[in-house]
């Protein structure tokens, strides 16, 4: 299956998105991930999740496959700045160990998990300082 209709710049690592990504165009194939920005990970995952596994449909599926997720934290490699990072490579997906469910983070690279889901922040992981 093609890379969300992208002509070049994706490579085989982007395979498996196709129409399942929902309206993907050439912009979502830069640089390698065809699962952003229109369909990336739900907020439980960081901006870099799709890129880290080649941007395949399976990657997005493991995070929920929501169309809005990555948009909430920038939706692109450059978007990790909004999560406290200058580059996506310093953002990491992480999840709560207890107390908040899957919508917040708890890790050395993230802000602590709150005791209630409503106060869990941020949407995507912070840069490791």
From Swiss-Prot:
The segments labelled 6 X 4 AA repeats of C-C-X-P in the record are 28-112
Asked whether the UniProt record includes Repeat among its keywords, one would answer yes
Residue windows of the sequence repeats: 28-31, 34-37, 40-43, 90-93, 109-112, 119-122
| Tissue expression as described in the entry | Expressed in hair root and not in skin. Expressed also in liver and skeletal muscle.
Q: List GO terms (cellular component aspect).
A: cytosol; intermediate filament
Q: Which domain of life is it from?
A: Eukaryota
Keyword annotations for this protein, in alphabetical order, are: Keratin, Repeat
Which family does the record assign?
A: Belongs to the KRTAP type 5 family.
Q: What does this protein do?
A: In the hair cortex, hair keratin intermediate filaments are embedded in an interfilamentous matrix, consisting of hair keratin-associated protein (KRTAP), which are essential for the formation of a rigid and resistant hair shaft through their extensive disulfide bond cross-linking with abundant cysteine residues of hair keratins. The matrix proteins include the high-sulfur and high-glycine-tyrosine keratins.
Q: What is known about its subunit structure?
A: Interacts with hair keratins.
**This chain belongs to which protein, by name?**
Keratin-associated protein 5-6
């Amino acid at each position: 299956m093609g890379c969300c209709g992208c002509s070049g710049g994706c490579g085989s690592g982007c395979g498996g998105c196709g129409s399942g990504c929902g309206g993907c165009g050439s912009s979502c194939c830069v640089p390698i991930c065809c699962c952003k920005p229109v369909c990336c990970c739900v907020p439980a995952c960081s901006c870099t999740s799709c890129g880290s596994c080649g941007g395949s449909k399976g990657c997005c599926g493991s995070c929920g496959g929501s169309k809005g997720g990555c948009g909430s934290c920038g939706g692109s490699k450059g978007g990790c700045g909004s999560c406290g990072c200058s580059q996506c490579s310093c953002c990491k997906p992480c999840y709560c160990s207890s107390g908040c469910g899957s919508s917040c983070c708890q890790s050395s690279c993230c802000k602590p998990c709150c005791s209630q889901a409503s106060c869990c922040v941020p949407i995507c992981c912070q840069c490791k300082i």
